[in-house]
Amino acid sequence: MSEMTQTAEEQPIDELVGWVKQHDFSLNLPPERLAFLIAIAVLSNERFDEELGEGELHDAFTIVTRLFEDTGEASAFRANNAINELVKQKLISRFTSEITDGASIYRLSPLAIGISDYYLRHRQFSKLKLSIQLSMVADEMAKAIEAAQKGGTPGHWRRNVYGVLKYSVGEIFDQIDLNQRVMDEQQQTVKQQIADLLNKDWREAINNCESLLSETSATLKELQDTLQAAGDELQTQILDIQEIVYGDDELEFVGETLFGLQMKLDRITSWGQQAIDLWIGYDRHVHKFIRTAIDMDKNRAFSQRLRQSVTDYFDAPWLLTYADAEKLTDLRDEALVLRDDEVMGQAPIDVEYEEFEQVNDLLSERIGDMLKAHKQQGAPIDLGLVLRDYLAAHPRTHHFDLARIVVDQAVRLGYSESDYQAIQPDWQAINDFGAKVQANVINKY
């Protein structure tokens, strides 16, 4: 989510709705109008001052109308109407000055630039683009770490650390997030292509579907590897800066920015694996659909096409690929014999679960009583100390389950103010075997 969207979220909804109503904002962009806007954007980029005259807009409208023949002729009247519509929707701005002898000049608005940029610059998602963006983020993070290690006044931190993190690193993260959303759209496009293929010739459809599925799977795997490698480095850099600013109240604004970047980084890195998992499920669905369609082909249309392919082999040669699986040997008894022997085995699952629940409830009640003493006395709960003292009286094999129950009961009693201030707690040892816990002191009940 971009910084602009986050700022807008802080305002009341009714205030934002009133703002839209007051300025009469609206958008209506049929395909020909969108094409006209993109044509204006392309022509504008070719100009040094990014300004266009009315004649150039008429030329762009003529090009668009030539491709959209059903919309009508490219008359000056229709061109002026199209221009006025874009001006009314605040997509282009019209200026008139004496320098141009009263002729109007036009310039794209920020809204139009955003729309045209989406269709022109973000149409293609590539591993190279992602790699460059991740490299840029790493360079900016390195600058921030260097400035943080030097230290200085709050002004130095705000200018050389906070500014770089918020406006350089944060914006690049937003661009990466946008590119990932473009990749999501491309996956939907591939799915539509596969659906169209399955409605056509079966033999060609199977080959093309396999190609599309494999190509997209390989792309997602490469992207995930790239994200994983870069994500580990970025995570380390964020933790390094957090360690420097930890405990300094004057640098709390830097810690809050790092917390926001951490959330963005987690979302970016988790996208890759999630996209792969979803695509694997879709891949299996397509193959299952093809097998089911062949099995349920009542008219034997696929079989008929296969026989026809064999008949026409010499005119249209093809290759046949098959798999020869090894036979499985069945080692079960051919006949089952009833036996009167005593049954030996484990307790049923229901009984085991019931016994575990009884033990768990007793422990939870006992631990809850222990922690309530802190609440009654108004004393804070330092989970690190509480766990260490409590686990010391129990066998090592029980430490994991007991620690889980203690934490669960503690968070039911209260919370820590530090959690809402994005303060990262230190790791504390809770036993002599290397187990650690990271939790703020609970001081609100």
UniProtKB/Swiss-Prot annotation:
The protein's matches in HAMAP family, at most eight in alphabetical order, are given as: MukF (MF_01803)
Q: Which domain of life is it from?
A: Bacteria
Q: Respond yes or no to whether keyword Cell division is given for this record.
A: yes
Entry keyword set = Calcium, Cell cycle, Cell division, Chromosome partition, Cytoplasm, DNA condensation
GO molecular-function annotation terms?
A: calcium ion binding
Q: Can the keyword Magnesium be found in this entry's annotation? A: no
Subcellular localization, as worded in the UniProt entry: Cytoplasm, Nucleoid
Subunit relationships: Interacts, and probably forms a ternary complex, with MukE and MukB via its C-terminal region. The complex formation is stimulated by calcium or magnesium. It is required for an interaction between MukE and MukB.
**Descriptive protein name:** Chromosome partition protein MukF
Record's CDD domains?
Answer: MukF_C, MukF_N
Q: Which Pfam families match?
A: KicB, MukF_C, MukF_M
Concerning its family, UniProt says: Belongs to the MukF family.
Its biological purpose: Involved in chromosome condensation, segregation and cell cycle progression. May participate in facilitating chromosome segregation by condensation DNA from both sides of a centrally located replisome during cell division. Not required for mini-F plasmid partitioning. Probably acts via its interaction with MukB and MukE. Overexpression results in anucleate cells. It has a calcium binding activity.
